[in-house]
């Protein structure tokens, strides 16, 4: 298990005493791995063609001598001032067409030939110098890729991308974008500009294609970066760090990570949940953390790396609350439980100045190993040292939930339904919750992935569904799978054009019904659905359904569609489909999926009884189940185990009732029968 984090010795080159202290403190913190060089370009190449690698040589030597490993970063995330000054074409232009000044970070043009050559040049020198170092564990390519540039270079590249996509046929583009609307038809490629608040932003096909282009252009930049790395160090794995927001742990929307993941050896991501916030319970947030971990793990169906986290507080929330005692270990254990093989931090040592000087770190401005934060980090390190056999293990799942970046983009862009109540990822959370609370493993997959290994596939709010995706869903159900779909699904194709003639025929055949009208509700509107003799509150959306061969399962209680069907089921060839026509409560999802779980004989991770707020997750290999029992509540909780397991930290046998203290986690192993 990797334990360590983002180390910035280039900020302390005039303080050899600090650098010496770092090595000593790394041992005390039970750390073993450090990502180095992420923002070090100006320290590596202070003037064009003048290289100063000696300080990095020393860091490699000292960390290796200390028994540590290095994840070496390429420095493209922040360039030196001389580069911006001499080559202003590397500067990004924003959507308002304003050229940015040098400063900040992550603000370069991904299309710039000069910047691509300069990054490849420095990357080659790093690979040649450090590629054979025993301490080199992995390449960390750039940092948190994101953003977009609207300069002339990017406009030309976008037009070339469009020409390729539409086979140099501008009529095909006009058809796909529905440009006769508002007289927006193009008759020459040169007329097309990227979306802008001071220009075109109402053509949804343009907006969608621009986002696709930004993803492809960023991947192209990444591929340019790794050319020398693959050439010189073909056996060193490559990653870059993905992101999510901090409020609801929504996947980063600037790039389609499902595309990016195909080009990485290992998925890594930066997690900063707002623990102890005042808008939700700790368990609610833990559920969302579980969801995003399961998404990023599922991208490659293998363990991922937690590349960044904070051992205490961040510095960029509205309220930067410190983790309470015990929460750092608990939140770290949760990451491991859902598939991480690392706990890495930003940052190892707090900066003395600038914008991140108050961001949490292992080592504070006091340079002390006796404070609470450092001791809790050391405890995490000791825990990870006992979990080495968990590294590389997997989390098989019978249940999958489908998340799609392009669908998210298109749905958010749609000027319809409830502008503030679409809440696509939050809706997926509510379906995921019904399984997380039952300790049933879930894969969160994308539309390109193989569906065949799952028994239950849940597809909420798939507004954008291409004919290809519909055909794959149809094949899943036909071959024996159970498929659940919801309101606002199957509305538009891959160009964000609505399907004509009603719901797509393949969906009508699969579900035995057709949605004919979607009612969008005000927050104060009241209605409910009767399902299995219980009433469940609905909000935001209610879809009127026209049944053909489907079986009605739930009924609306009020409004002009009272007593009509809200929930359906339908046998389809060897499988079965369900349609949920309204946004219903968490209790509905618990009961609805509870029925399916019984019918499909889907088993939880472990036979265990506990109260809400306790989560049990399992990783496994051919011989053992590795069991993580976590208390995300603010009070002591009893957990009743149906069979004995061995505590991996203490060696004791756990059986029957086990008590977990507030924020406590127990990690156990059980041999497979």
Curated annotation (Swiss-Prot):
The active site is at residues 144, 308. Gene3D superfamilies: 3.40.50.880, Glycosidases (3.20.20.80), Golgi alpha-mannosidase II (2.60.40.1180). Optimum temperature of the activity is 50 degrees Celsius when using both lactose and ONPG as substrates under 10 minutes assay conditions. Stable over a wide range of temperatures (4-42 degrees Celsius), and when kept at these temperatures up to 1 month. Most stable at 37 degrees Celsius, retaining 90% of its activity after 1 month at this temperature. Half-life time of activity of approximately 7 days, 5 hours, and 30 minutes at 55, 60 and 65 degrees Celsius, respectively. GO terms for cellular component: beta-galactosidase complex. It comes from the Bacteria. One of its GO terms (biological process) is galactose metabolic process. Keywords: Glycosidase, Hydrolase, Metal-binding, Zinc. It holds the Pfam family Glyco_hydro_42C. GO terms for molecular function: beta-galactosidase activity; metal ion binding. Catalyzes the hydrolysis of lactose to its constituent monosaccharides glucose and galactose. Possesses a low level of transgalactosylation activity for the production of galacto-oligosaccharides (GOS) from lactose. This is Beta-galactosidase GalA. It comes from Bacillus licheniformis (strain ATCC 14580 / DSM 13 / JCM 2505 / CCUG 7422 / NBRC 12200 / NCIMB 9375 / NCTC 10341 / NRRL NRS-1264 / Gibson 46).
């Amino acid at each position: 298990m990797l334990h360590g984090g983002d180390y910035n010795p280039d900020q302390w080159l005039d303080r050899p005493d600090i650098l010496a202290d770092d090595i000593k403190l790394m041992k005390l913190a039970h750390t073993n791995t450090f990502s180095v060089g992420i923002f070090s370009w100006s320290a590596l190449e202070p003037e064009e063609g003048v290289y100063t690698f000696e300080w990095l040589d020393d860091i490699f030597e000292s960390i290796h001598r200390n028994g540590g490993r290095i994840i070496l970063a390429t420095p493209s995330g922040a360039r030196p001032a001389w580069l911006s000054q001499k080559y202003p074409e590397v500067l990004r232009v924003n959507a308002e067409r304003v050229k940015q000044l040098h400063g900040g970070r992550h603000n370069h043009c991904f299309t710039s030939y000069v910047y691509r050559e300069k990054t490849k040049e420095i990357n080659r020198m790093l690979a040649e110098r450090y590629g054979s170092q025993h301490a080199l564990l992995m390449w960390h390519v750039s940092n948190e890729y994101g953003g977009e540039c609207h300069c002339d270079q990017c406009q030309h590249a976008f037009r070339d991308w469009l020409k390729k996509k539409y086979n140099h046929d501008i009529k095909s583009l006009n058809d796909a974008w529905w440009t006769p609307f508002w007289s927006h038809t193009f008759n020459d490629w040169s007329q097309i500009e990227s979306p802008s608040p001071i220009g075109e932003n109402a053509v949804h096909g343009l907006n969608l294609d621009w986002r696709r282009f930004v993803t492809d252009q960023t991947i192209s930049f990444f591929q340019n970066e790794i050319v020398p790395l693959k050439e010189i160090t073909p056996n060193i794995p490559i990653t870059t760090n993905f992101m999510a927001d901090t409020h609801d742990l929504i996947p980063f929307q600037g790039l389609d990570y499902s595309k990016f993941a195909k080009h990485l050896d290992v998925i890594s991501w930066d997690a900063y949940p707002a623990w102890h916030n005042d808008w939700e319970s700790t368990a609610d947030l833990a559920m969302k953390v579980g969801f995003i971990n399961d998404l990023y793990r599922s991208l490659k169906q293998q363990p991922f790396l937690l590349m960044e986290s904070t051992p205490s507080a961040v510095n960029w929330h509205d309220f930067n609350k410190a983790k309470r005692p015990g929460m750092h270990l608990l939140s770290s254990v949760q990451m491991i439980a859902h598939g991480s093989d690392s706990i890495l931090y930003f940052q190892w040592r707090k900066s003395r100045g600038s914008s991140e000087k108050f961001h949490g770190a292992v080592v504070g401005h006091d340079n002390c190993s006796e404070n609470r934060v450092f001791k809790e980090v050391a405890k995490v390190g000791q825990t990870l040292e006992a979990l080495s056999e968990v590294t590389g293990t997997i989390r098989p799942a019978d249940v999958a939930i489908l998340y799609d970046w392009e669908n998210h983009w298109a749905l958010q862009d749609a000027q319809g339904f409830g502008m503030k109540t679409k809440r696509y990822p939050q809706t997926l959370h509510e379906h995921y919750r019904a399984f997380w609370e039952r300790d049933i493993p879930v894969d969160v997959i994308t539309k390109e992935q193989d569906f065949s290994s799952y028994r239950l596939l849940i597809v909420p709010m798939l507004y954008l569904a291409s004919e290809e995706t519909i055909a794959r869903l149809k094949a899943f159900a036909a071959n024996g799978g159970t498929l659940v779909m919801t309101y606002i699904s199957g509305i538009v194709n891959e160009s964000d054009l609505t399907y004509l003639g009603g719901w797509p025929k393949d969906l009508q055949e699969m579900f035995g019904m057709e949605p004919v009208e979607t009612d969008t509700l005000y927050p104060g509107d009241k209605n409910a659905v009767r399902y299995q003799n219980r009433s469940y509150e609905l909000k935001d959306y209610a879809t009127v359904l026209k049944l053909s061969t489907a079986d009605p399962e739930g009924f609306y209680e009020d409004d002009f569609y009272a007593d009509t069907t809200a929930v359906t089921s339908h046998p389809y060839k060897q499988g079965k489909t369900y349609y949920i026509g309204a946004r219903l409560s968490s209790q509905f999802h618990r009961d609805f999926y509870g029925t399916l779980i019984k019918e499909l004989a889907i088993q939880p991770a472990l036979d265990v009884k506990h109260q809400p707020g306790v989560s049990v997750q399992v990783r496994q290999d051919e011989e053992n189940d590795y069991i993580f029992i976590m208390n995300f509540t603010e009070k002591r909780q009893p957990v009743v185990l149906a069979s004995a397991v061995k505590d991996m930290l203490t060696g004791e046998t756990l059986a029957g009732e086990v008590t977990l203290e507030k924020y406590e986690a127990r990690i156990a192993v059980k041999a497979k029968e």
